[in-house]
Amino acid sequence: MASSNLIKQLQERGLVAQVTDENALAERLAQGPIALYCGFDPTADSLHLGHLVPLLCLKRFQDAGHKPVALVGGATGLIGDPSFKAAERKLNTSETVNQWVEKIRQQVAPFLSFNCGDNSAIAANNYDWFGSMNVLTFLRDIGKHFSVNQMINKEAVKQRLNRDDQGISFTEFSYNLLQGYDFACLNERYGVALQIGGSDQWGNITSGIDLTRRLHQNQVFGLTVPLITKSDGTKFGKTEGGAVWLDAAKTSPYKFYQFWINTADADVYRFLKFFTFMSLEEINQLEEEDKSSGKAPRAQGVLAELVTRLVHGEEGLIAAQRITRSLFAGNVTELTANDLSQLAQDGMPGIELKIGQDLQQALVNAELAPSRGQARKLIEAKSVSINGSLQTDAEYTFGEDDRLFGQYTLLRRGKKNYSLISWQS
């Protein structure tokens, strides 16, 4: 992705919501590599899908020869960003935030190259400059450059001020100053000339641009990526179980893969532009092939494969595909102990049973049958399988051989209704 037309290419992919002084930024990029940054506040112990677009934008810029700075907000994470939030955030302890900072740094690192010469990525933490700053320095050197009149007119703050049930504390009101100073500080330390972020960060970004100009007399820029929406109007990046996380311990690679497999046809080609590095030509060609094939589209499989590999690596992708293939075929022989652990984590409904349980009661407990009588009928009708093998004995009681890796049993009614039994010793 050549620097001279990078902004244009991002726009063609639908990745630009707003940009400050677009012509001047394009001119600056055409002159040669710049340093840019994106901030990630540790408000949880993992990033989620909402963070992926700006994170991948950092990578797109690095691939084009620019120097990315990934800023984790060890200080701002202690405060909480009020932007477009309906209520005050819960303040977390410094110990918790420090742990989350480290986890998020580890999550960001694989997406960027930290050893590639002049445009090697930099990992930064804003606690490094705020941790030792006293309140008088903050008020004199930063606060004096901010107009309260302008701050309360920012859309992100105005929404909170206009709510009768929720005001805004001075703590959260001050967040705008902290993020603004981040930009000025990174400009001074690393020559950072561009901040990218989600569209909800526009007010914070423009504050940083203004403060950098006042403190250092430097022209810097801001670019926001759009809030990702689904064509049906529902929230992107959410499932019935909540947010889709990048941490495999919070959202398993299998569940992550399935999230993308289930993308609607109306969204999938747009998401390929947002979340993959396929060229627009390749995406358009895939769309044309899908439309003319008369078969189920390939695009969801391509999207799931590329994004799962990006986030969970080749091993995570292979496991997710193996689990998907095994469940579709009803054959569990390929599944590993880790695969079953993923299913127990969040991959399918599950129950815990004590050893010695009979099949009829297990079907009732797993909500695969409404009663023991109905369970008996299902078994006798050859509709029930255990670990992929049909079971027709209505009086069957589970034995040791049914416990895969000594721990799990896969129960199935019909072709698609599964439950995973985890055995209690």
Curated annotation (Swiss-Prot):
The UniProt keyword set, sorted, is: Aminoacyl-tRNA synthetase, ATP-binding, Cytoplasm, Ligase, Nucleotide-binding, Protein biosynthesis, RNA-binding
Subunit and partners: Homodimer.
Question: What is an example of a GO molecular function annotated in this UniProt entry?
Answer: ATP binding
Record family assignment:
Belongs to the class-I aminoacyl-tRNA synthetase family. TyrS type 1 subfamily.
UniProt lineage: Bacteria, Pseudomonadati, Pseudomonadota, Gammaproteobacteria, Enterobacterales
Q: Quick check: keyword Cytoplasm in the entry?
A: yes
GO biological process, any: tyrosyl-tRNA aminoacylation
Q: Which CDD domains match?
A: S4 (cd00165), TyrRS_core (cd00805)
One family from Pfam that matches here is tRNA-synt_1b
EC numbers for this chain: 6.1.1.1
Motif extent ('KMSKS' region):
235-239
Which organism was this protein described from?
Erwinia tasmaniensis (strain DSM 17950 / CFBP 7177 / CIP 109463 / NCPPB 4357 / Et1/99)
What is the stated purpose of this protein? Catalyzes the attachment of tyrosine to tRNA(Tyr) in a two-step reaction: tyrosine is first activated by ATP to form Tyr-AMP and then transferred to the acceptor end of tRNA(Tyr).
What the entry lists under NCBIfam families is as follows:
tyrS
Name of the featured protein: Tyrosine--tRNA ligase
Please classify the protein's predominant subcellular localization into one broad category.
cytoplasm
Protein origin, superkingdom: Bacteria
